[in-house]
Structures are given as C-alpha cells and as structure tokens.
A protein has these predicted regions:
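Active-site C-terminal subdomain of aminotransferase-like
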Residues: 22-23, 199-288, 292, 397-398
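Conserved active-site segment immediately N-terminal to the catalytic lysine
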Residues: 187-199
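PLP-dependent enzyme catalytic core of the Aspartate aminotransferase-like
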Residues: 338, 342-398
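Conserved PLP-binding catalytic core of the aspartate aminotransferase-like
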Residues: 296-327
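Active-site phosphate-binding strand-loop segment of PLP-dependent enzymes
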Residues: 123-180, 193, 201
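Conserved PLP-anchoring active-site segment centered on the Schiff-base-forming lysine
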Residues: 84-100
Length: 398
C-alpha cells in the first residue's frame, strides 16, 4: 500500500531497471535553476553549449545535432519521418520490442518495410543485411537497434555499417540504451541518423531525445518531394530554432535543457573512455555474482548497461521484484514479449553503474531468493563480484 505522503514526496529508490537510471544531485540542482524564456539570449547560449557537448558524446562533427523535446520514442519518430517518404523502402532489423517499434513507426509514415527478424536475445549477422540489400536494391534506409533494451542484446555495428555504406543506403541507429555507456563513434561508423534518450546512460530525467544527422541524411531531407508528415518533428524547422536563425518553433523544456547540459558535462569530466570502462567493470562484477548464484544470461552478445537474465526455475518473478522494491527500495525490470514472467532486466547505467549498486542488488537478490526456497550458497555472489572487480583492476594496471 502506498502512503499518501509518498504521492506528495516520492520515496528515494535505487533505480536498476531498464530506465530511468539514478540522477546525479548536480543534475537535480540544475533542474531547479530559474526558468528563462525560450528565446532568452542566456538560454540560447545554453542550447549552443548543449549541442557542443552532444557532439562530443556522439563523437561526431554533424552540424544537425540537438535534443528533441520528447523521450527517445520522439527521437525515433523524428529520424524516421524526416528520412522516409511514403513509398520509400526501408529495411528494419527486429531483435526485440524496440526493433518492432521502429518497424511500426516506419509503416505508419508510409514506408515499404522489409524486416529482418531474429530470435529474441540474438543479434543480426552482417550477411543477413547484405542479402536483404541485394534483394531490395532500392532500399533508402536501414534501421537497427544498437542496444535492444527488451533483451539486453548488444548489436555489433562496424561490419554492418560498412555494408550499408557501400550500398549507398542511410543507416539509422537506436542508441537509447547505449549513448554514454557503450562505444558509439557515430562518425567512425558512418551512422546517418542516431537517436537516444536522456534517462539511461546519461542519468538525466526523461524528457529529451538527443539526435544527430549526417550530411548525407540532410541531403536526403533536402531532396524530399513531400512535406514531413509531422509538423512538430520537422527537422527543417527545428534546425532553424537550434541554428543561427533562432526561428521560433515550439516552447522548449527549458529546465530539462539545463539538466541535460549538466549531465553531459559530468560525462565529459569523467571522460568517455573511463565512463565506458566503468560500465564494463560493473557489468562483469554483476555477471560474476549472478552466475555464482546459478542465474543465466539471455543474450548472446550482452550489453554492459542492461543485463537481461533468466528468472530461476520455480521462482515467482513478480514476487521477487515486489520484495526488492518494498524491502530494499531497489527497482529492476520485468521481461517483455516472450520473456514476460521469465526474465529480469537489471540496469547498470550512468549513476546506477557503481560498486554500491552491484553489491546492493546482489546481496538483496541473494537474501530474497534464499528465503523463496532457491538453492544457493550465501555469500558466493559477493565473493565472485569482488574477484571480478580485482581482475578488472589488474587488467587496467597491466
């Protein structure tokens, strides 16, 4: 039962689900700064700083790099509706919920969609994309999910990007659960359109969607024969607001821009390479601890930011998650689609990727599972995590 005061003053949680992640105190303080007008010279300067920081985190020189007012789903729609006109052919790789969502969005905007579907928990092989491009040579856009949040799958990208580039199609990438936590060199991989969310590895509240478009993508937009179907997400108008013209388009979420700028500054202060290494280390610690309890991972290529694991046989998925929340204040995610009731998703993103988070969730899970009748060796998980941490530190020294 939720107490009435919890509705007025929400409780402090340890956010270790598929998102949002814990938010840094500095970011929360930035949210509380005075609200400015959306064309105030000071706010326009903050927008410029945010763009510069986004370019660094995306590792791109793309001129059109900005934050869409909306969540990652708005970023997805913005990328699709600006690149696709009715009748255009698009290949979409579906390895989980969010590949399926991209397919749905593309169809709604009139694309002729050709789908590459693989079993949940697996990734798309480059050969599949090469075969599909050969079968559909008029393909304009190839869309795939870099970090499939529903399965914890990490999609290898380099070879795929080379195949798509050689064909001449545009590469659209969902990086909602990877930007700021997993390597994502946009320019090096020749990604033409990429979108993310603020609430995952950037550890900012949800509400903005960072996006970036290559020169090739802008050229495709400029050659459109029809207007972009969405007025709100029309990048030709948003470009004028975020660019030098400063033409009014809509009232931006001012304070969320403050928060995003602060979150990006935190990323750059840590350094992208160190941040990615931190996510890798804590993933290895968590994985070692879970496997010491006899818990198996789902994906063949696991994300370091989102850990998808099988619920042990005979264990009540919802009951364990409820006990984690009520007894320890820890939130983890449930399974989706074919994994509903059969999987847990444990996020280690941004502020939520720390030694404290790993040891807390392992200790809590171990205690709860033991009382639920699951056979395990108490203390084995934390010992395994500590050993994995030591191995990671030795590897860094070497």
């Amino acid at each position: 039962m939720i107490a009435e005061q919890d509705l007025q003053f929400p409780p402090q949680r340890v956010l270790m689900g598929p998102g949002p992640s814990d938010v840094a105190p500095r970011v929360l303080r930035a949210l509380a700064a005075p609200t400015l007008g959306h064309l105030d010279p000071c706010y326009l300067r903050i927008m410029d700083q945010t763009r510069d920081l986004l370019r660094k985190v995306f590792q791109t020189n793309n001129d059109m790099t900005l934050a869409i007012s909306g969540t990652g789903s708005a970023g997805m729609e913005a990328c699709v509706c600006n690149l696709i006109e009715p009748g255009d052919e698009m290949i979409v790789c579906v390895a989980g919920v969010f590949g399926g969502r991209m397919k749905d969005v593309a169809q709604r905007y009139g694309a002729v969609v050709h789908t590459i579907e693989v079993p949940w928990g697996t990734h798309v092989e480059p050969e599949k994309i090469a075969e599909m491009l050969k079968a559909y040579p008029q393909t304009k856009v190839v869309g795939l999910v870099h970090a499939e949040t529903s399965t914890g799958m990490h999609q290898p990208m380099e070879e795929i990007s080379q195949i798509i580039q050689a064909h001449g199609a545009l590469l659209l990438v969902d990086a909602v659960t990877s930007l700021g936590g997993v390597p994502l060199p946009v320019d090096q991989w020749k990604i033409d359109a990429c979108y993310s969310g603020t609430q995952k590895c950037l550890s900012c509240p949800p509400g903005l969607s960072p996006v970036t478009f290559s020169a090739r993508a802008l050229e495709a937009m400029d050659k459109r024969k029809s207007k972009v179907t969405s007025w709100y997400l029309d990048m030709s108008m948003l470009r004028n607001y975020w660019g030098s013209d400063r033409a009014y388009h809509h009232t931006a979420p001012i304070n969320m821009t403050y928060a995003l700028r602060e979150a990006l500054q935190i990323v750059m202060e840590e350094g992208l390479a160190k941040r990615i290494a931190r996510h890798t280390k804590h993933h290895r610690m968590l994985r070692a601890g879970l496997e010491a309890m006899g818990i198996r991972y789902i994906p063949t290529h696991s994300l370091t930011t989102l850990n998808a694991i099988h619920v042990p046989e005979g264990v009540d998925d919802a009951r364990v998650r409820r006990r984690l929340l009520e007894e320890y204040g820890i939130e983890i995610g449930a399974g989706l689609g074919p994994f509903k009731g059969k999987a847990w998703r444990i996020g280690l993103m941004g502020e939520s990727s720390s030694r404290r988070h790993v040891t807390l969730v392992l200790a809590a899970l171990e205690s709860i599972l033991q009382t639920e009748g699951f056979s395990l060796e108490l203390g084995a998980a934390l010992s395994a995590a500590a050993a994995a941490e030591k191995e990671a530190e030795v590897a860094v020294v070497v």
